[in-house]
């Protein structure tokens, strides 16, 4: 065995440069942790660009898990194995040590199951669809995740690993084109000459593998479990959660990873063997735990295979490593491994910036090729900007071979540490810029999911602007004059039905609640109620306007502070500010300096740095040079949050001369009296308090800034006291999910809004799993958190569930301690328990949802949510936001009753929360959840009652319209009428074009929101790109939408056509007499006015010319 020594930071470079670059062999580079494997893979692609460099990821589940691994991982593993089988040339595989122990499908399997597509190839959409189903792809109405595909007539969309979407167009059973498309917009981006499709999973469900499964199941477990849901699903050709743990049952033989290569050289380090031994110990432990759990009849329909069936032994894996031609790497502690540390030290001694010294080092190494590597685009751009400021030349490169001398080469290249070689100097941007991790942005995908959900569900309550509250029954095609037309069928009281043409879908709004009394068609009560409400909304809008105006008129002295002292304070912030944080801070600086009272809402997700923004605002005001003893009050809803803020503020301001105190139930009566006295005298600069601060006995010397954290959690009386302070004080409110009233004020421009949507660089996404209640997984999760020095939350939806969970936890994790907290306990008792949990006096907090806000415990990073289907989307998101707030990754397990059948709505809600691990998606989710769950106690009782009368969407629209009127702005809200168009054409989206009714309703809703011809044309282009050429019926619909938009401009309420021409009815309040008379006199032969004031235009019409003639008629009318 060859042994080699070099700096650890240069592992990937030296491995490739020394062994792989000029070799004719296959290689496997083995790491001892997964993050290193992925980073080395990205580095390897930079150092040696090749199609034959592969990353083989590990499962993100534990051994014997009943939850399937992430679909991206499953698909990437299968794709890698397929390419190793089919691609020619020398290969490099980078993987984690545990993958040497996994038994995989036989090597020759993937040679049979892959498909190479290219234009003009003979293949039909149906044949491709069949191939995809048999290779573990999931068919959906639209594609969102890896491993999904959608069929729309002669177009097939699918998503392959690394979230690459492809669209295959067919024509007469031939592949016409292959295009890549953007998953977020669903629009094609570029054409491809070929596409290779591999299975989406190591297990494919086709007749051969299903037959193997039946035989091997019978051989291993003795009987066919026909009443077993897992067995029924698999034998029926359907995937089942966690079935990957049964992989050997699907094949007659197995292979190891190295069997897929040609006598490969394995490169590993001293930690590899330890990782293998630890994994073997782990899978044996989980096997025993699973057998014990099976005795308790938990999820007993999952059979358990022995370790020898699923894994190689550590002895076999280590023997593989110790073969003669393999390479053992060890690491040296050279000076080259700490280049930036040396630069930093020298810059400190010489009193220069780190970049001044860096450029001196670069000059000294001018004969080398200099590469600065950034792991994220944002730091790449920052590096570029710094180089430009120093007026150095730079060269943007994608691969090492593009690097040049006499310039600085910059690249997207993840490096943990800088290092040097005889030819190159590699500088890690992460060391220069304190770049911590590579944040992934999946917000676009989340928005896509939410857009899909924003459709009308059958049975949902709606509000018609003219007829009131009804129930949407279904989409129904009716025959009008021999032509089919899609209508929305709405049920009203007395079993009356209303049919709304799909092109007028905008006349209905979602009600936003599941319970309401249906209105009666034709009744005047709806219009009366709506008119009354309109007057009340006018009062609300006026009140909001008056509040805003009063603050604008109430001028105050601009806040001035010492900039040098402020900069020193900012420099002590231990992290790099995000762009959103800096924008929010700049907004506050402008507010405080413009001579008017600030009233700003900072809206940002949990842990996104709102508190640091608040502390900088507090510094600006408390250190004001032109105020006498200026004071800052920070008001929070809970004692524990008060203690946390007090500790943070005290630490952050420790080098200043500011006096900071707290006032809450943890402060004794005697101490509270002293604090209040010092507050009144001006000795205290910053006070942090709970409701104790909101008391009439509290007097301030000179309160200049009020910071309110989580305003929605304060009671009515406390809010009244806050209002009295607001009239003469700068106000900064902070929230992750603001109350709708505050949000309304922000959205309508009455309150200033700053949004912090960018996560800090060192925040990791919370990994979320949805699964049946499984004691083995729960035990592992709780112990894993315990052994990494952390604590766990166990959340139940009802107090009644607590006793049962206590019993189960005593059985599952007897070695861990717990305490219980719920809403029926006294506030002091809850605070006491929370303080003990914060201090680490027990391991698990069992609680109801009372912990969903105001808790920041950075070492509590695991959460089990029991019966997660009983909680709302926003609740689930808020709860999950309690974990993963520090540098440790958080793990959330949303458990479901094992045998309870979930409704599609519940499953979709849980799917959203599982998929939306993207940092910063809480604001979007909370807004959407209000739409799903309705209003209830989210809004004050007065507003809540008003919203019940018309529903959330219509209420918001009416309020925005009224404020626009007061502000003398254009109104984009309610229209006085909606034109009805009847041209005797077929108008609908055919099932053979868009078959999924949910997707079709979503498209109809989008059509209802098109506002001009350009938007209609863009929508039409998108439809052609996604679904193919527009059918005549769909094209008619979009043409009618254009005609409807023109009719609205011309005050035309109805446009009807017959064989002999058109009939036009004008809106009753429109003053059109002069225009109509002028039109009739111009077109005397064709135009006539009927006694009921309708305009008749006589012309023989033929089907295909109706649209053209209608457009011409309206154009002529508009020109008069």
UniProtKB/Swiss-Prot annotation:
Q: Where is this motif: DEEQ box?
A: 709-712
Pfam families for this protein: CarD_TRCF_RID (PF02559), DEAD (PF00270), Helicase_C (PF00271), TRCF (PF03461), UvrB_inter (PF17757)
BP-aspect Gene Ontology terms: regulation of DNA-templated transcription; transcription-coupled nucleotide-excision repair, DNA damage recognition
| GO molecular function annotations of the record | ATP binding; damaged DNA binding; DNA helicase activity; hydrolase activity
Q: What is its main location?
A: cytoplasm
Q: Which SUPFAM superfamilies match?
A: CarD-like, P-loop containing nucleoside triphosphate hydrolases, TRCF domain-like
Q: Which residues bind ATP?
A: 604-611
Enumerate the spans annotated as Helicase ATP-binding domain.
591-756
Q: Which Gene3D superfamilies match?
A: 2.40.10.170, 3.40.50.11180, P-loop containing nucleotide triphosphate hydrolases (3.40.50.300), Penicillin-binding protein 1b domain (3.30.2060.10), Transcription-repair-coupling factor, D7 domain (3.90.1150.50)
Q: Quick check: keyword Phosphoprotein in the entry? A: no
Q: What are the annotated disulfide bridges?
A: none
According to its UniProt record, where is this protein located? Cytoplasm
Q: What EC identifiers does the entry list? A: 3.6.4.-
| Any single Gene Ontology cellular-component annotation | cytoplasm
Q: Which residues form the Helicase C-terminal domain?
A: 777-931
Identify the InterPro entries for this entry: CarD-like/TRCF_RID, CarD-like/TRCF_RID_sf, DEAD/DEAH_box_helicase_dom, Helicase_ATP-bd, Helicase_C-like, Mfd, P-loop_NTPase, RecG/Mfd
Q: Which UniProt keywords apply?
A: ATP-binding, Cytoplasm, DNA damage, DNA repair, DNA-binding, Helicase, Hydrolase, Nucleotide-binding
Name the family.
In the N-terminal section; belongs to the UvrB family.
Function, please? Couples transcription and DNA repair by recognizing RNA polymerase (RNAP) stalled at DNA lesions. Mediates ATP-dependent release of RNAP and its truncated transcript from the DNA, and recruitment of nucleotide excision repair machinery to the damaged site.
NCBIfam families referenced in this protein's UniProt entry, alphabetically: mfd (TIGR00580)
According to UniProt, the name of this protein is Transcription-repair-coupling factor
- What is the scientific name of the source organism? Rickettsia bellii (strain RML369-C)
């Amino acid at each position: 065995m060859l042994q080699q020594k070099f700096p650890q930071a240069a592992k990937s470079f030296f491995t490739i440069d020394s062994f792989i670059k000029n070799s004719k062999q296959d290689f496997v580079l083995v790491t001892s942790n997964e993050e290193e494997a992925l980073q080395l893979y990205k580095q390897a692609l930079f150092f040696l660009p090749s199609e034959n460099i592969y990353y083989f990821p590990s499962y993100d589940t534990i051994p014997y898990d009943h939850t399937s691994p992430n679909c991206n991982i499953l698909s990437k593993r299968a794709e890698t194995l397929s390419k190793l089988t089919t691609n020619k040339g020398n290969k490099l595989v980078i993987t984690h040590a545990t993958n040497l122990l996994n038994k995989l499908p036989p090597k020759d399997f993937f040679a049979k199951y892959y498909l190479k597509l290219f234009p003009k190839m003979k293949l039909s959409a149906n044949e491709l669809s069949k191939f995809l189903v048999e290779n573990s792809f999931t068919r959906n109405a639209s594609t969102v995740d890896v491993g999904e595909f959608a069929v729309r007539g002669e177009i097939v969309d699918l998503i392959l690993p690394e979230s690459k979407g492809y669209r295959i167009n067919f024509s007469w059973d031939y592949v016409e084109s292959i295009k890549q498309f953007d998953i977020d917009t669903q629009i094609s981006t570029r054409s491809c000459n070929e596409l290779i499709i591999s299975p989406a999973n190591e297990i494919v469900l086709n007749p051969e593998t299903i037959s193997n499964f039946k035989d091997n199941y019978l051989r291993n477990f003795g009987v066919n479990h026909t009443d077993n849901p897992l067995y029924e699903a698999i034998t029926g050709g359907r995937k089942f959660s966690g079935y990957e743990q049964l992989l050997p049952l699907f094949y007659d033989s197995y292979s190891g990873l190295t069997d897929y290569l040609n006598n490969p050289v394995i490169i590993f380090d001293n930690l590899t063997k330890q990782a293998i031994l630890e994994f073997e110990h782990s899978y044996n432990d989980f096997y025993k735990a699973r057998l014990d759990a099976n005795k308790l009849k938990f999820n007993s329909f999952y059979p358990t295979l022995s370790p020898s069936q699923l894994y190689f032994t550590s002895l076999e894996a280590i023997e593989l490593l110790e073969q003669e031609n393999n390479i053992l790497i060890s690491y040296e502690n050279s000076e080259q491994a700490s280049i930036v540390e040396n630069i930093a030290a020298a810059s400190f001694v010489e009193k220069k910036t780190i970049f001044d010294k860096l450029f001196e080092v670069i000059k000294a190494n001018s004969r080398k090729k200099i590469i600065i590597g950034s792991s994220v685009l944002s730091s790449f751009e920052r590096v570029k900007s710094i180089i430009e400021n120093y007026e150095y030349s730079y060269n943007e490169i994608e691969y090492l071979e593009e690097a040049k001398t006499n310039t600085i080469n910059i690249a997207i290249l993840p490096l943990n540490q800088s290092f040097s070689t005889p030819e190159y100097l590699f500088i890690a941007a992460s060391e220069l810029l304190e770049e911590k991790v590579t944040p992934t942005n999946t917000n676009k995908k989340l928005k896509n999911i939410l857009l899909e959900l924003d459709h009308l569900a059958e049975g949902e309550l709606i509000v018609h602007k003219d007829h009131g509250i009804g129930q949407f029954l279904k989409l129904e095609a009716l025959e009008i004059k021999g032509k089919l037309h899609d209508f929305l069928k709405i049920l009203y009281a007395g079993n009356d039905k209303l049919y709304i043409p799909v092109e007028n879908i905008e006349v209905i709004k979602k009600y936003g609640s599941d319970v309401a009394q249906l209105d009666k068609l034709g009744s005047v009560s709806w219009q009366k109620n709506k008119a009354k409400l309109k007057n009340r909304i006018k009062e609300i809008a006026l009140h909001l306007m008056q509040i805003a105006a009063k603050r604008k008129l109430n001028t105050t002295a601009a806040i001035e502070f010492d900039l040098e002292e402020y900069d020193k304070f900012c420099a002590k912030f231990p992290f790099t500010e995000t762009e959103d944080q800096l924008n929010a801070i700049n907004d506050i600086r402008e507010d405080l300096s413009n001579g008017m009272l600030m009233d700003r809402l900072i809206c940002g997700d949990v842990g996104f740095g709102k508190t640091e923004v608040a502390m900088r605002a507090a510094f600006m005001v408390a250190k004001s040079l032109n105020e006498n003893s200026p004071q800052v009050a920070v008001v929070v809803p809970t004692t524990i949050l008060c203690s946390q803020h007090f500790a943070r503020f005290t630490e952050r301001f420790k080098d200043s001369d500011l006096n900071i105190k707290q006032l809450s139930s943890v402060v004794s009566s005697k101490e509270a009296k002293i604090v209040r006295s010092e507050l009144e005298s001006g000795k205290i600069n910053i006070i942090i308090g709970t409701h104790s601060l909101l008391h009439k006995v509290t007097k301030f010397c000179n309160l200049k800034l009020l910071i309110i954290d989580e305003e929605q959690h304060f009671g009515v009386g406390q809010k009244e006291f806050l209002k009295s302070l607001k009239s003469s004080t700068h106000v900064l409110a902070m929230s992750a999910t603001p109350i709708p009233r505050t949000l309304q004020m922000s959205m309508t421009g009455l309150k200033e809004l700053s949004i912090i949507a960018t996560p800090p660089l060192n925040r990791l996404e919370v990994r979320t799993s949805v699964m049946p209640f499984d004691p083995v997984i729960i035990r592992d999760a709780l112990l894993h958190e315990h052994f990494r020095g952390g604590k766990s939350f166990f959340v139940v939806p009802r107090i009644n569930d607590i006793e049962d969970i206590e019993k189960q936890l005593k059985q599952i994790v007897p070695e861990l301690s717990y305490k219980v907290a719920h809403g029926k306990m006294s506030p002091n008792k809850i605070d006491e328990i929370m303080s003990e949990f914060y201090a680490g006096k027990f391991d698990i907090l069992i609680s109801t949802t009372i912990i969903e806000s105001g808790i920041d415990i950075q070492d509590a990073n695991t959460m089990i949510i029991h019966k997660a289907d009983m909680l709302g989307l926003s609740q689930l998101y808020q709860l999950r936001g309690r974990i993963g707030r520090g540098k440790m990754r958080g793990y959330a397990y949303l458990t479901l009753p094992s045998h309870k059948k979930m409704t599609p709505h519940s499953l979709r809600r849980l799917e959203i929360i599982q998929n939306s691990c993207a940092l910063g998606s809480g604001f979007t989710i909370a807004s959407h959840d209000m739409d799903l769950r309705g209003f209830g106690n989210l809004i004050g009782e007065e507003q809540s009652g008003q919203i019940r009368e018309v529903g959330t969407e219509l209420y918001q629209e009416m309020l925005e319209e009224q404020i626009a009127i007061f502000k003398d702005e254009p109104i984009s809200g309610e229209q006085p009428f909606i034109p009805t168009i009847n041209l005797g054409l077929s108008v609908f989206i055919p099932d053979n074009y868009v078959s999924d009714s949910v997707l079709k309703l979503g498209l109809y809703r989008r059509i209802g929101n098109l506002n001009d011809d350009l938007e209609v044309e863009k929508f039409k282009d998108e439809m052609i790109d996604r679904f193919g050429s527009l059918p005549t019926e769909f094209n008619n619909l979009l043409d009618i939408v254009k005609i409807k938009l023109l009719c609205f401009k011309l005050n035309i309420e109805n446009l009807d056509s017959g064989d002999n021409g058109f009939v036009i009815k004008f809106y009753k309040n429109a003053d059109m007499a002069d225009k109509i008379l002028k039109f009739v006199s111009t077109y005397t032969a064709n135009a006539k006015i009927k006694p009921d004031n309708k305009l008749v235009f006589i012309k023989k019409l033929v089907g295909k010319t109706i649209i053209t003639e209608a457009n011409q008629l309206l154009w002529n009318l508009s020109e008069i």
